[in-house]
Amino acid sequence: MSSEQSDCWICQSLSRDPHLVYYETKTSLAKLNPDQLFQGYTFLTLKQHREHLHLLPENMRKQFLDDMLTVATALAKALNPDRLNYELLGNAQAHLHWHIIPRYISDPMWGRPIWAGNRPRRRLASEDYSRLKDTIQAHLPHPRTRKKTPLATQR
Protein backbone atom coordinates (compact mmCIF):
# COMPACT_ATOMS: atom_id res chain seq x y z
CA MET A 1 0.00 0.00 0.00
CA SER A 2 1.31 3.45 -0.90
CA SER A 3 2.24 5.69 1.99
CA GLU A 4 0.34 8.58 0.40
CA GLN A 5 -2.75 8.74 -1.76
CA SER A 6 -3.12 11.69 -4.13
CA ASP A 7 -6.90 11.90 -3.70
CA CYS A 8 -6.73 11.87 0.11
CA TRP A 9 -7.08 15.35 1.59
CA ILE A 10 -5.61 14.09 4.88
CA CYS A 11 -2.44 12.90 3.12
CA GLN A 12 -2.28 16.33 1.50
CA SER A 13 -2.83 18.06 4.84
CA LEU A 14 0.31 16.54 6.36
CA SER A 15 2.45 19.19 4.67
CA ARG A 16 -0.02 22.09 5.13
CA ASP A 17 -0.04 24.51 8.04
CA PRO A 18 3.39 23.64 9.48
CA HIS A 19 2.89 26.44 12.02
CA LEU A 20 0.21 24.27 13.69
CA VAL A 21 2.45 21.20 14.12
CA TYR A 22 3.73 20.64 17.64
CA TYR A 23 4.77 16.99 17.83
CA GLU A 24 6.04 14.43 15.37
CA THR A 25 7.26 10.87 15.53
CA LYS A 26 8.21 8.46 12.77
CA THR A 27 4.57 7.30 12.75
CA SER A 28 2.40 10.32 13.54
CA LEU A 29 2.05 14.06 13.24
CA ALA A 30 0.18 16.16 15.82
CA LYS A 31 -1.14 19.55 14.87
CA LEU A 32 -3.63 21.98 16.29
CA ASN A 33 -6.97 22.25 14.56
CA PRO A 34 -7.10 25.76 13.05
CA ASP A 35 -10.52 26.04 14.74
CA GLN A 36 -9.72 26.39 18.44
CA LEU A 37 -13.25 26.71 19.82
CA PHE A 38 -12.13 23.80 22.01
CA GLN A 39 -8.75 24.96 23.29
CA GLY A 40 -6.09 22.43 22.35
CA TYR A 41 -8.20 20.51 19.78
CA THR A 42 -5.62 18.37 18.01
CA PHE A 43 -5.46 16.13 14.98
CA LEU A 44 -3.03 13.25 15.36
CA THR A 45 -2.55 11.80 11.90
CA LEU A 46 -0.89 8.57 10.85
CA LYS A 47 1.77 9.55 8.32
CA GLN A 48 1.07 6.56 6.08
CA HIS A 49 -2.23 6.32 4.27
CA ARG A 50 -3.93 3.49 6.12
CA GLU A 51 -7.65 3.09 6.68
CA HIS A 52 -8.18 0.54 9.46
CA LEU A 53 -6.61 0.46 12.91
CA HIS A 54 -7.03 -3.30 13.27
CA LEU A 55 -5.15 -3.92 10.00
CA LEU A 56 -2.03 -1.96 10.93
CA PRO A 57 1.15 -3.92 11.49
CA GLU A 58 1.51 -4.46 15.23
CA ASN A 59 4.50 -2.15 15.71
CA MET A 60 2.83 0.68 13.79
CA ARG A 61 -0.45 0.21 15.66
CA LYS A 62 1.31 0.28 19.03
CA GLN A 63 3.28 3.40 18.10
CA PHE A 64 0.17 5.18 16.81
CA LEU A 65 -1.73 4.38 20.01
CA ASP A 66 1.27 5.39 22.15
CA ASP A 67 1.51 8.67 20.23
CA MET A 68 -2.18 9.31 20.90
CA LEU A 69 -1.71 8.72 24.62
CA THR A 70 1.41 10.90 24.71
CA VAL A 71 -0.40 13.80 23.06
CA ALA A 72 -3.53 13.33 25.20
CA THR A 73 -1.47 13.27 28.39
CA ALA A 74 0.34 16.46 27.37
CA LEU A 75 -2.98 18.16 26.58
CA ALA A 76 -4.41 17.11 29.95
CA LYS A 77 -1.37 18.36 31.86
CA ALA A 78 -1.00 21.58 29.88
CA LEU A 79 -4.64 22.68 29.67
CA ASN A 80 -6.43 20.92 32.53
CA PRO A 81 -9.67 20.25 30.61
CA ASP A 82 -12.72 18.83 32.35
CA ARG A 83 -12.77 15.93 29.85
CA LEU A 84 -10.82 14.69 26.86
CA ASN A 85 -12.77 13.30 23.91
CA TYR A 86 -11.08 10.86 21.53
CA GLU A 87 -12.51 10.13 18.10
CA LEU A 88 -11.16 7.88 15.35
CA LEU A 89 -13.91 7.83 12.75
CA GLY A 90 -12.91 7.50 9.10
CA ASN A 91 -16.38 8.15 7.71
CA ALA A 92 -15.65 11.40 5.86
CA GLN A 93 -12.09 10.45 4.87
CA ALA A 94 -10.69 6.97 5.26
CA HIS A 95 -7.23 7.83 6.61
CA LEU A 96 -6.40 7.05 10.23
CA HIS A 97 -6.39 10.19 12.33
CA TRP A 98 -7.45 10.96 15.88
CA HIS A 99 -9.47 13.94 16.94
CA ILE A 100 -8.27 14.65 20.49
CA ILE A 101 -10.61 17.25 21.88
CA PRO A 102 -10.21 18.88 25.28
CA ARG A 103 -13.65 19.70 26.65
CA TYR A 104 -14.48 22.34 29.21
CA ILE A 105 -17.68 22.82 31.20
CA SER A 106 -17.73 26.36 29.82
CA ASP A 107 -17.62 25.29 26.16
CA PRO A 108 -20.74 26.01 24.06
CA MET A 109 -21.24 22.32 23.22
CA TRP A 110 -20.73 20.89 26.72
CA GLY A 111 -22.67 17.67 27.17
CA ARG A 112 -23.06 17.15 23.42
CA PRO A 113 -20.83 15.82 20.65
CA ILE A 114 -18.95 18.60 18.89
CA TRP A 115 -20.55 17.49 15.62
CA ALA A 116 -24.11 18.15 16.89
CA GLY A 117 -25.52 21.02 14.86
CA ASN A 118 -23.88 24.29 13.97
CA ARG A 119 -21.24 25.65 16.26
CA PRO A 120 -19.22 28.82 16.29
CA ARG A 121 -15.64 28.79 14.99
CA ARG A 122 -12.63 30.32 16.70
CA ARG A 123 -9.44 31.22 14.86
CA LEU A 124 -6.45 32.48 16.81
CA ALA A 125 -3.79 35.04 16.00
CA SER A 126 -0.53 33.35 14.95
CA GLU A 127 1.17 34.31 18.22
CA ASP A 128 -1.68 32.65 20.16
CA TYR A 129 -1.23 29.38 18.22
CA SER A 130 2.46 29.60 19.00
CA ARG A 131 1.84 30.15 22.72
CA LEU A 132 -0.62 27.26 22.82
CA LYS A 133 1.88 24.96 21.11
CA ASP A 134 4.61 26.00 23.55
CA THR A 135 2.31 25.28 26.50
CA ILE A 136 1.54 21.78 25.20
CA GLN A 137 5.13 21.04 24.16
CA ALA A 138 6.32 21.76 27.70
CA HIS A 139 4.51 18.56 28.72
CA LEU A 140 5.76 16.32 25.91
CA PRO A 141 8.58 13.85 26.48
CA HIS A 142 11.73 13.62 24.43
CA PRO A 143 12.30 17.19 23.21
CA ARG A 144 14.46 15.79 20.40
CA THR A 145 11.30 14.45 18.70
CA ARG A 146 9.46 17.74 18.74
CA LYS A 147 8.78 19.21 15.34
CA LYS A 148 10.40 22.60 14.87
CA THR A 149 8.24 24.83 12.74
CA PRO A 150 9.18 28.03 10.93
CA LEU A 151 7.09 30.04 13.40
CA ALA A 152 8.79 28.48 16.42
CA THR A 153 12.29 29.01 15.01
CA GLN A 154 11.70 32.71 14.27
CA ARG A 155 11.48 33.62 17.94
Model region roles, listed by residue range:
Residues 1-155:
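HIT superfamily nucleotide-processing domains
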